[in-house]
Amino acid sequence: MAEVITGRQTATVDDDVVVFLIGMRINRLRRVHTEAVIQDIDIPIARAAEFLAFLHADVGVLPIWICPIRAPAPGTDATLYPLPRGTLSINFGFWDTVRSREPRERGFVNRKIERKTTALGGVKSLYSDSYFGEDEFWSIYDRGAYEALKARYDPGRTLGDLYTKCVLRQ
């Protein structure tokens, strides 16, 4: 619960949930489809302008965080996050809700971003919603390296695999 300096109680988490649910209901009644787009995408610097143009033209999210990053040096063990070693990339971070009057399948905009990222040789952080097919996911995130770590640190398979957690959200 939040309190102001006087100690008087203000909005609670329950109030926030009610406002959110009312907003969703209003959108449904108005036939507005919404999709949360929360992503961190790393694109090689040579293709960064193309990705930014795509975000503006095809996605329309604002604001966009733009930050240069350098991948680990060649020979460094970091195969689960597949940026080309020693290269400079641009990280694009964006958090917004995209609205449309056209009915869309779940994850439509996020999937469009994933396809563009892959086409430009980029990689996406997996903390956000992901919609990759399983074969595509493992072609990007090195199943062999992941399985080697899994065999060593979770040989009994107590915890789910990366695809199940990140894409299927189980």
Regions found by a protein language model. Name each.
Residues 1-109:
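C-terminal substrate-recognition/cap domain of FAD-linked oxidoreductases
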Residues 24, 105-111, 115-170:
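Activity-critical C-terminal alpha-helical subdomain
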